[in-house]
């Protein structure tokens, strides 16, 4: 089958607070589609306000997938995302509908569109050794070690992200090659679909920065801190879990632990979200084949639907 004959899939990418979720709903309505979330935080139940999760009404109007599939105590790997997304794409297409992939987790998009590197399996003994060193010296010391071994990976991985930090060190110890080298050398897979790429982004960083601040203040008014308090009171969650490391949640957790005051929490959360958006925008610059649309443009959904129809 030639590339032109492959079933089409809308791939809607953009930084946080750019309006992707609303545009995805409008596209799905216009094109008889179903939405597949490409967001590492929307998979968690009980994390609604801080993730800007589509409302029950919105999800009832348009089918959404990969939302509310895990408890916050669980881990959702990139490999699992890829497997489940491919299965959903096949199912939606088989039912004669159009898959609309929408989100901002660029690692997931990259894994789906460009494939996963072939990495060694986890080594329990080595992991225990790394965890013992972390308990003795702290994860920041291990992050400094990773920075010497694999600077690009260290730049991507936060010192307070033990899961990814441990994996990067484990891969190097097992193979003698850095995670960055192995990922760079991975081959692009033959996709079973034809991606129709769309990038939605505000006109400038200043506009995006203001949208982020406004949205976070609105989340606070809607009860975001109370949402995190409910997670905090459970007693079985901690800041090393991927769910609690999500932007905004991590800063709220620190406030609830008494690490800093409310004003500092708000400031840190907004700054962290802006930094996250900057990393997303850097990644999106690679999407030279995508149709770029500006957030807030009059007639945005009509234009996006027209672009997709022209390429179906």
Curated annotation (Swiss-Prot):
This one is known as tRNA dimethylallyltransferase
Binding-site positions, ATP: 14-21
Residue numbers marked as site, Interaction with substrate tRNA: 105, 127
Ligand binding (substrate) = 16-21
Q: Which reaction does it catalyse?
A: adenosine(37) in tRNA + dimethylallyl diphosphate = N(6)-dimethylallyladenosine(37) in tRNA + diphosphate
InterPro entries tied to this protein: Dimethylallyltransferase, IPT, P-loop_NTPase
Originating organism: Methylococcus capsulatus (strain ATCC 33009 / NCIMB 11132 / Bath)
Q: Which UniProt keywords apply?
A: ATP-binding, Magnesium, Nucleotide-binding, Transferase, tRNA processing
Q: Where is this region: Interaction with substrate tRNA?
A: 39-42, 163-167
Sorted alphabetically, which PANTHER family does this protein's record hold?
A: TRNA DIMETHYLALLYLTRANSFERASE
């Amino acid at each position: 089958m030639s590339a032109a004959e492959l079933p089409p899939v809308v791939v809607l990418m953009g930084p946080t607070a750019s309006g992707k979720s609303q545009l995805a709903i409008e596209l799905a309505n216009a094109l008889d589609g179903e939405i597949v979330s490409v967001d590492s935080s929307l998979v968690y139940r009980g994390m609604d306000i801080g993730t800007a999760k589509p409302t029950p009404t919105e999800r009832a109007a348009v089918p959404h997938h990969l939302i509310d599939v895990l408890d916050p105590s669980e881990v959702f790997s990139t490999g699992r995302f890829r497997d489940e997304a491919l299965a959903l794409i096949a199912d939606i297409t088989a039912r004669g509908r159009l898959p609309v992939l929408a989100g901002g987790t660029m690692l997931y998009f990259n894994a789906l569109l460009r494939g996963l590197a072939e990495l060694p399996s986890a080594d329990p003994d080595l992991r225990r050794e790394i965890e013992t060193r972390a308990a003795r010296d702290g994860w920041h010391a291990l992050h400094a070690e990773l920075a010497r071994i694999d600077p690009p990976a260290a730049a991507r991985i936060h010192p307070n992200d033990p899961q990814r930090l441990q994996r990067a060190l484990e891969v190097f110890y097992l193979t003698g090659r850095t995670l960055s080298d192995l990922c760079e050398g991975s081959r692009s897979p033959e996709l079973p679909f034809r991606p129709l790429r769309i990038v939605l982004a505000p006109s400038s960083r200043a506009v995006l920065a203001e949208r982020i601040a406004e949205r976070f203040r609105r989340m606070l008014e809607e009860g975001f801190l109370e949402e995190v308090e409910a997670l905090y009171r459970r007693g079985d969650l901690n800041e090393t879990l991927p769910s609690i490391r999500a932007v905004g949640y991590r800063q709220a957790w620190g406030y609830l632990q008494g690490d800093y005051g409310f004003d500092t929490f708000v400031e840190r959360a907004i700054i962290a979200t802006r930094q996250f958006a900057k990393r997303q925008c850097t990644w999106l610059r690679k999407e030279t084949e995508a149709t770029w649309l500006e957030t807030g443009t009059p007639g945005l959904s009509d234009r996006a639907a027209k672009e997709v129809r022209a390429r179906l």
